[in-house]
Amino acid sequence: MIQPQTHLNVADNSGARELMCIRIIGASNRRYAHIGDVIVAVIKEAVPHMPLQRSEVIRAVIVRTRKELKRDNGMIIQYDDNAAVVIDQEGNPRGTRVFGAIARELRQLNFTKIVSLAPEVL
């Protein structure tokens, strides 16, 4: 469960290291975002000499959350951190690599490019 002011790790090589959620895209007054939701975030920590700089406002899709994810078949998945992948306006990832495992639900939400870059899909 990601809400505004939540800090997230970045799971790609776009140049950002840490994000802070500002807004959840989709509804005007949604309180929490879950895996697969698009958020507006600000970069709190960035790698030097990369295209993305600190205090830049970007869009990101959530790929891992500490809160459990319950699937229809009864399986429960929980990750060790909250993480997101930086995307552009069309939904394509800004980086060329994705680090760590991501959830299978992203494929159903048409983030197939992120799923294909991921080393492990749970």
From Swiss-Prot:
Entry keyword rRNA-binding: yes
GO MF annotation, one: structural constituent of ribosome
First-listed, main subcellular location of the protein, grouped into a coarse class: plastid
GO biological-process terms attached to the record: translation
InterPro entries according to UniProt: Ribosomal_uL14 (IPR000218), Ribosomal_uL14_bac-type (IPR005745), Ribosomal_uL14_CS (IPR019972), Ribosomal_uL14_sf (IPR036853)
Record family assignment: Belongs to the universal ribosomal protein uL14 family.
Assembly information from the UniProt record: Part of the 50S ribosomal subunit.
Listed NCBIfam families: rplN_bact
Protein name, entry field: Large ribosomal subunit protein uL14c
Gene: rpl14
